[in-house]
């Protein structure tokens, strides 16, 4: 939750649960092959790191140029409770036939009342470091934290077609500035609150790492049309695509910045180091 609050336009969280009512086997098994145990975190599926030190890894990855632009839209068959999610991928550089796509759904505000909904707290007592977020100073709280005190965000509900992505997504590779569209039919549980669901699209490179992702609230995805700007979002300048240059790189105490701005809108520049 803290990462989402700090980087709302760039951070896409998926919380994978294990041994509680929110467990989703496809994600739990896939995550389990990449980590040594819980709690753990992955930034773009690169390396197993403690959640308390996720931010530096995120800041190193988020500045990398993505290889494609992603657009999301969705439609809902309410009678059969099937959501069709469309992911449109437009490469900005040529990609090979080993790249894959996937879509996922996550849910915020998930709660329960039984003891199974209590949260195991690895950080209780402070011996494993300090962690604050989601309304908790985890190192100051009990283990477990009672269900009555927990509200879970970013809960991974489904990933399609699998954790590893869709085989043969680009059988002949992906050409620059060519849009590739993928449709995924997702059964929607009556236990989910669609007003709190996020629709997530992801592009995986030939090493299985996440190259780029996109996220929309479900209500926005249902109203969105690919080929047009996503509703409720702002345009972000991306270095390789829109003429933003930062030099020298790496830098010590001074940098130069040049950018090509094509309109008279107000722009905001935020500079952070790897520690945020």
What are these regions (language model features)?
Residues 3, 34, 243-245:
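Residue-level detector of alpha-helical hydrophobic segments embedded in or interacting with membranes
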Residues 1, 83-86, 181-183, 238-241, ...:
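Short amphipathic alpha-helical surface micro-motifs
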Residues 8-230:
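Short, conserved sequence motifs used for protein processing/export or organelle targeting and
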Residues 1, 39-42, 248:
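Short, proline-centered helix/strand-breaking motifs
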């Amino acid at each position: 939750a803290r990462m989402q609050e700090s980087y709302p336009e760039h951070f896409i969280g998926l919380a994978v649960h294990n041994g509680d009512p929110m467990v989703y086997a496809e994600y739990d098994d896939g995550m389990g092959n990449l980590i040594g145990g819980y709690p753990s975190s992955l930034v773009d599926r690169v390396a197993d790191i403690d959640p308390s030190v996720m931010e530096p890894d995120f800041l190193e990855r988020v500045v990398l140029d993505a290889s494609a632009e992603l657009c999301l839209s969705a439609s809902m068959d309410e009678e059969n409770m099937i959501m069709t999610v469309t992911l449109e991928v437009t490469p900005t550089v040529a990609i090979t036939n080993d790249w894959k796509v996937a879509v996922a759904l996550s849910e915020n505000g998930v709660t329960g009342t039984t003891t199974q909904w209590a949260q195991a707290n690895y950080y209780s007592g402070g011996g494993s470091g300090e962690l604050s977020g989601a309304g908790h100073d985890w190192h100051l709280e009990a283990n477990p934290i009672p269900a009555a005190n927990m509200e879970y965000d970013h809960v991974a509900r489904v990933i399609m077609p699998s954790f590893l992505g869709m085989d043969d997504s680009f059988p002949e590779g992906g050409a620059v500035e060519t849009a590739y569209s993928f449709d995924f039919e997702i059964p929607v549980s009556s236990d989910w609150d669609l007003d709190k669901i996020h629709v997530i699209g992801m592009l995986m490179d030939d090493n299985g790492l996440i190259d780029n992702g996109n996220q929309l609230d479900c209500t926005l995805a249902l109203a969105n049309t690919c080929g047009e700007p996503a509703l409720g979002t702002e345009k972000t300048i991306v270095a390789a695509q829109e003429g933003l240059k930062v030099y020298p790189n790496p830098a010590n105490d001074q940098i130069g910045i040049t950018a090509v701005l094509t309109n008279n809108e107000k722009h905001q520049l935020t500079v952070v180091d790897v520690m945020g």
